[in-house]
Amino acid sequence: MLTCNKAGSRMVVDAASSNGPFQPVALLHIRDVPPADQEKLFIQKLRQCCVLFDFVSDPLSDLKWKEVKRAALSEMVEYITHNRNVITEPIYPEVVHMFAVNMFRTLPPSSNPTGAEFDPEEDEPTLEAAWPHLQLVYEFFLRFLESPDFQPNIAKKYIDQKFVLQLLELFDSEDPRERDFLKTTLHRIYGKFLGLRAYIRKQINNIFYRFIYETEHHNGIAELLEILGSIINGFALPLKEEHKIFLLKVLLPLHKVKSLSVYHPQLAYCVVQFLEKDSTLTEPVVMALLKYWPKTHSPKEVMFLNELEEILDVIEPSEFVKIMEPLFRQLAKCVSSPHFQVAERALYYWNNEYIMSLISDNAAKILPIMFPSLYRNSKTHWNKTIHGLIYNALKLFMEMNQKLFDDCTQQFKAEKLKEKLKMKEREEAWVKIENLAKANPQYSLCSHASTVSMPLAMETDGPLFEDVQMLRKTVSDEARQAQKDPKKERPLARRKSELPQDPHTKKALEAHCRADELVPQDGR
């Protein structure tokens, strides 16, 4: 008979009847022995599968015995899937032990870059060399957990906190196939062992804390969040305080990490699940997102806009009122972003019917915040697609409340006139300074070295519409044109940036001459 003994972190297999090197034995099929002997043979096969083979340094070694183990694992998967009353009490410790021997191991150091440099679409993950055996061990253990014969009361002696902790450590594996099996395995354990649920949540929290505040690298964050999404969905109401703390202190800080793109869809799902459970959490969640809003990372900003729209899709009108002003101040900044994808994603909010109904109910607060940004960028944004989306948003605002739209237009004009007057005062102050400088007796000595010129303002808002009726007509026409344009097939062509024209810059460029034109040439 084969026995498996622990020696440190390695499993050493002994053959009781052999003095030479260990040789696995191809045992009979379980179905070929009498029912009375099947349990004994099942245990022998489980112990036989405790043998570990080298797939890394010498992949071609022991090919015969690797196949013996693979065949034994495949047979056991079929055996517990298609037979009832075969998971008896003596089987439990053998199954858990066999799983632990094969799976619980020290993971190799990461071969890919960490943090923001890691690109899951470009960087190839390191695949587990022993996967032909590991896959079957995972499949067998899952069938074991899912079997109608499985009894958690017996299994809890062997599937304990230590087992769960070692299982969670494997989530850092680079092999996505292994992480997928781990995700399903941990979810089954969470569902069947009520006494382990709080411990599992606590240990996942610890992994997230280390990831956020220490390492910023972990391969299994997306899978752990996917498990949590299912767990959150099952939380009873009202939510416990520990669950609210988990949202505010663990999930929301995950938005800070550079590698957010790797797990953002799963994170956004978890956040939205919480808000569907308890709408009073909306304000702290949105304010935290605004606090963590990316300043210089445009792709990450697009992710935040995606998540924010998902939140607005489930928000209660009473909660929307609490966050609308800081939220739309941020959206106004996004509309003004020179990165066209950020501006475009923000303007797509105006295509969402539920969001538009919320805006309509609170237009008196929202339109004054958004109008200056929309108007300015309708003239000056370099991307023509953005112009069309802005005119569409302005048209919707105009149809929503025409009087308010006209008031915002007049207010914007008044503010622009104030700015121009202020700029004129500054220019006059500079003229006075220049005149005082000219009155200085030393002025003539240094005037040839430098020329004092007053600062010049660059008009970036385009010409103001003097007539509100003209603005209305322009907005309607441009919005109508923008709806037609996307349907046209446009030829691929290199587009030149369209920047605001500053006449003073133009004159300075025309007056500019190269340094060698000023230096006298020999013989001239």
Curated annotation (Swiss-Prot):
Where does the UniProt entry say this protein principally localizes? nucleus
Keywords, A to Z, come to: Acetylation, Centromere, Chromosome, Nucleus
Keyword set includes Transmembrane helix:
no
Motif (Nuclear localization signal) positions are 472-489
Which Gene3D superfamilies does the entry mention? Answer: Leucine-rich Repeat Variant
The modified positions for N-acetylmethionine read M1
Record's subcellular location: Nucleus; Chromosome, Centromere
The entry's cellular-component GO terms read:
chromosome, centromeric region; cytosol; nucleus; protein phosphatase type 2A complex
Organs and tissues of expression: Highly expressed in testis, heart and spleen. Also found in brain and skeletal muscle.
Q: Does the keyword Manganese apply?
A: no
Give GO BP annotations, semicolon-separated.
signal transduction
Pfam families associated with the record = B56
What does the function comment of this entry state?
The B regulatory subunit might modulate substrate selectivity and catalytic activity, and might also direct the localization of the catalytic enzyme to a particular subcellular compartment. The PP2A-PPP2R5C holoenzyme may activate TP53 and play a role in DNA damage-induced inhibition of cell proliferation. PP2A-PPP2R5C may also regulate the ERK signaling pathway through ERK dephosphorylation.
Family affiliation: Belongs to the phosphatase 2A regulatory subunit B56 family.
Assembly = PP2A consists of a common heterodimeric core enzyme, composed of PPP2CA a 36 kDa catalytic subunit (subunit C) and PPP2R1A a 65 kDa constant regulatory subunit (PR65 or subunit A), that associates with a variety of regulatory subunits. Proteins that associate with the core dimer include three families of regulatory subunits B (the R2/B/PR55/B55, R3/B''/PR72/PR130/PR59 and R5/B'/B56 families), the 48 kDa variable regulatory subunit, viral proteins, and cell signaling molecules. Interacts with SGO1. Interacts with SGO1; the interaction is direct. May interact with TP53.
Q: What is this protein called?
A: Serine/threonine-protein phosphatase 2A 56 kDa regulatory subunit gamma isoform
The uppermost taxa in this organism's lineage are: Eukaryota, Metazoa, Chordata, Craniata, Vertebrata
* Gene designation per UniProt: PPP2R5C
